[in-house]
């Protein structure tokens, strides 16, 4: 017997009638007549009263289904297949946990005596990749600590990985302070196509939050280095991340306009909300409601949309849920998530072969599964959300303090409406 899917969301605003379904990630505009007909049939729990042609269209986008649980089981099956797929190898490599910055909010803590990656560890990484002979692609993210402190290690290890002949892509998360012309020019040969650099605001705000270990400012030099990247690494996209909390969110537009006025084609800028994983009662982290107020204000007052208001629909979980996704420390120690880097209790093994903590490994692969969570299974966004960040889900399971639901969860109608407005603007602009 067919029924109205629980993964539908139907609403009207400003004389427009809209229907969203997360099983198919479809979003359609309805006539007022069809909207009223569907609403009446839903109230009677009888979809057979819907016109045959319309009912067939609704079947195609899964708004009418026989069994929602079966549809969710298919999605879960696909996720499990991906978790244990061996066609891609994703490595986050930390050549050092040391850093030249002394940022007070850094989740990694202070690694003043962090060892440097040795030739032995480098060779073990290459042998590890060779053992994964079924992998068709190799994706590397250079992380730390500050990866630019060990740029020579990045070069030697990259050249060895490229020599393996596997399809290769790389990115880097860096504070950007140690770039120079030589390093910028080298990015192309190192296949580093994406670099993320953090600025926490304009000069005054940034230098109060992101300073060198000795307390010296960093803003001006980072800006000059971003210009160097735009000039000498034109094939590399530079994304400026602005960490936001209650103390600096109201000044985001200042740094946004500053960067935009540099007119650098390969450079983009986006806000990112700082999460607090500590037990601090005086946290400056913005709660989900304030985050949405911020996003809403940017869109309604300034026409800015930094994140899509529409779910991607690719249903790809974070790489830590995949057996072939791992984080490598400078000693060859293995983690599943880069939030755990430097935490001895989160090391699950070694690049040299042995698994030392199966509990950590299995926890990340299978723990806090949203498909086992009654609240998630009833949630309209489960098919496109897949439970959100696995790290946050595990934290929630252990201490109940971290909210893992996406901002869209409590604001579905607004998000869909904003997406509709943007789509209409694009259509109108094309027709001009």
Describe every region a protein language model picked out:
Residues 204, 208-323, 329-331, 343-344:
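Radical SAM enzyme [4Fe-4S]-AdoMet core and its adjacent flexible, acidic
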């Amino acid at each position: 017997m067919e029924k109205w899917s629980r993964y539908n969301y139907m609403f009207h605003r400003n004389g427009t009638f809209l229907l969203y379904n997360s099983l198919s990630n479809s979003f359609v505009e309805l006539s007022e007549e069809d909207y009223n007909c569907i609403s009446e049939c839903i109230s009677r729990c009888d979809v057979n009263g819907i016109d045959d042609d319309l009912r067939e269209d609704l079947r195609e986008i899964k708004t009418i289904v026989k069994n929602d649980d079966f549809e969710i089981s298919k999605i879960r099956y696909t996720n499990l297949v991906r978790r244990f797929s061996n066609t891609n190898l994703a490595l986050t490599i930390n050549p050092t946990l040391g850093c030249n910055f002394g940022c007070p909010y850094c989740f990694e803590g202070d690694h003043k005596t962090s060892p440097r990656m040795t030739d032995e560890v480098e060779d073990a990484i290459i042998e590890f990749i060779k053992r994964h002979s079924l992998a068709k692609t190799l994706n590397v993210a250079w992380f730390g600590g500050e990866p630019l402190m060990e740029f020579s290690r990045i070069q030697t290890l990259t050249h060895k990985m490229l020599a393996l002949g596997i399809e290769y892509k790389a990115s880097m998360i860096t504070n950007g302070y140690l770039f120079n012309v030589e390093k910028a020019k080298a990015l192309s040969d190192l296949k580093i196509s994406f670099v993320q650099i953090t600025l926490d605001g304009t000069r005054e705000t940034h230098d109060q939050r992101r300073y060198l270990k000795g307390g010296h400012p960093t803003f001006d030099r980072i800006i000059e280095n971003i210009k160097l990247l735009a000039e000498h690494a034109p094939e590399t996209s530079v994304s400026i991340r602005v960490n936001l909390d209650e103390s600096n969110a109201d000044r985001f537009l200042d740094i946004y306009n500053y960067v935009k006025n540099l007119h650098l084609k390969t450079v983009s800028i986006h806000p990112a909300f700082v999460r607090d994983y500590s037990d601090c009662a005086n946290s400056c982290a913005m709660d989900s409601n304030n985050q949405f107020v911020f996003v809403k204000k940017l869109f309604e007052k300034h026409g800015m949309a930094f994140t899509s208001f529409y779910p991607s629909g690719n249903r790809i979980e974070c790489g830590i849920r995949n057996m072939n996704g791992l984080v490598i420390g400078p000693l060859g120690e293995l983690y599943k998530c880069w939030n755990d880097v430097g935490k001895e209790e989160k090391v699950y093994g070694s690049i040299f072969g042995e698994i030392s903590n199966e509990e950590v490994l299995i926890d990340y692969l299978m723990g806090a599964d949203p498909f086992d969570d009654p609240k998630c299974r009833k949630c309209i966004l489960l098919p496109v959300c897949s439970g959100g960040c696995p790290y946050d889900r595990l934290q929630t399971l252990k201490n109940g303090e971290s909210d893992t639901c996406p901002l869209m969860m409590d604001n579905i109608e607004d998000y869909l409406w904003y997406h509709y407005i943007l789509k209409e603007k694009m259509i109108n602009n094309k027709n001009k």
